[in-house]
Amino acid sequence: IEMITVVFQPYAVKALFHIPSHLFHGQNVDTDAMEDVELSDLVKQVTDTSDNAVSIRLIEQFFLRRLYTLPEYNLKRMFHEINLQPQINIAHLSETACLSSKQFGRIFADYVGTTPKEFIRIVRMQRALSMLQQDATIPFVQVAYECGFSDQSHMIKEFKLFSGYTPAEYLSVCAP
């Protein structure tokens, strides 16, 4: 194997490596730059083996060991709530986490690399894209409603901001 890539959930980088996620936003990170002795040992073990299955098992075991020692911040529950209710607001999330909005925002950004509001916008956009890819004939007003946008014009504005296209333009360029 020349290269192994590990893709993390939004909250995992901070939890596993104690490094704020925003430092990794949009980056490919070399493990040497992370200054983590255990991670360096893992890289050496993986490099020394020629069996891909063994390499994957070593990586899985490493991350599972780290997961079992994590403090409980309950961020996974927050992600689940955001995915279930895209119209959810930050006040509700911070209340659920038993934190002030400001403290919740800081912890969330530290783990995820973006603000809760921006993350919710991304989830809404992903959901809208998914709905349009599954059914190009679905009315935009229905997509807006089901994805938690305040109205269709708000969805179109966000869609254009994220993708550079309106939903109609997107469908004509990237037909499912």
Each PLM stretch: what is its role?
Residues 98, 119-122, 153:
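Conserved structured core elements
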Residues 110-114, 158-168:
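A secondary-structure capping/hinge motif
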Residues 1-91, 95-101, 115, 130-133, ...:
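Alpha-helical bundle regulatory/interaction domains
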Residues 107-111, 130:
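Basic, nucleic-acid-binding surfaces and adjacent catalytic neighborhoods in DNA/RNA-processing proteins
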Residues 104, 114-120:
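Short conserved catalytic/interaction loops centered on acidic-Pro-aromatic/His motifs
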